[in-house]
């Protein structure tokens, strides 16, 4: 039996897994086909891909800046070059906040942190049960695994469904609405304009980005 089961392979889950793996045994599970979570990337060809999750990362805290600086040194991420146009007058770009993207897609951070860790994709957790301080984790394919400890980094609706009976904190009963976004991924002929993103003044079309 391993020490930890971590559900979710986004930046949070990957960071926790990377840190714990130095001392403990663990497995990471994700219902998606690959690592990334909110920073998912869809590969189109060997050299082309779409970051259809988070568009970029803008580190603000001292700790996060240090974390990103280390990834910049290792060439896992890079600064997002080009102009960023804010056509919405209610929104203004903060020039102090640098924009960081993955060198090979925004899921590069998770993939780097998880490179030596046992990851299980296409693995959806449907139920958790605690018996004598041992966690029984059930999956959609009918299989079950036992772990000493369990860490959930999945989206709140899934977290609430799985863990409500075990979490006593008041936040678990909050009604949190998650708004869906529709992402259109397009390949167009290269243009000479040095513009990396548009923030539109439109109720429906909010953002257009060109990075990976």
Language-model segment annotations:
Residues 5-7, 18-45:
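Glycine-rich FAD pyrophosphate-binding loop
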Residues 19, 40-84:
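N-terminal FAD cofactor-binding segment of flavoenzymes
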Residues 5-7, 29, 125, 145-159:
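Short hydrophobic core segments
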Residues 121-136:
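A conserved short coil-to-beta-strand element within the FAD-binding core of flavoproteins
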Residues 56-62, 89-112:
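Short beta-strand to alpha-helix junction loop
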Residues 139-142:
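Glycine-centered tight beta-turn/hairpin loop motif at sheet-sheet or coil-to-beta transitions
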Residues 36, 45, 147-196:
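Central helical "cap/lid" subdomain
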Residues 13-14:
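N-terminal Rossmann-fold NAD(P) dinucleotide-binding loop
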């Amino acid at each position: 039996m391993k020490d930890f089961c971590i559900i979710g392979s986004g930046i949070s889950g990957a960071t926790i897994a990377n840190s714990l793996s130095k001392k403990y045994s663990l497995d990471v599970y994700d219902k998606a086909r690959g690592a990334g979570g909110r920073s998912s990337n869809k590969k189109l060809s060997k050299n082309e891909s779409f970051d259809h999750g988070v568009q970029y990362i803008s580190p603000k805290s001292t700790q996060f800046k240090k974390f990103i600086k280390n990834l910049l040194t290792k060439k896992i991420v890079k600064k997002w070059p080009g102009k960023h146009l804010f056509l919405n007058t209610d929104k203004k770009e903060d020039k102090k906040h640098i924009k960081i993207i993955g060198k090979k897609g925004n899921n590069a951070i998770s993939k780097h942190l998880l490179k030596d860790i046992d990851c299980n994709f296409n693995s959806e957790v449907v139920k958790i049960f605690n018996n004598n301080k041992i966690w029984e984790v059930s999956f959609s394919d009918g299989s079950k695994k036992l772990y000493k400890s369990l860490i959930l980094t999945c989206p709140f609706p899934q977290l609430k469904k799985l863990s409500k009976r075990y979490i006593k904190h008041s936040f678990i009963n909050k009604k949190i609405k998650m708004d869906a976004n529709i992402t259109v991924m397009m390949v167009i002929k290269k243009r000479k304009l040095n513009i990396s993103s548009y923030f539109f003044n439109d109720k429906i079309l909010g953002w257009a980005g060109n990075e990976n």
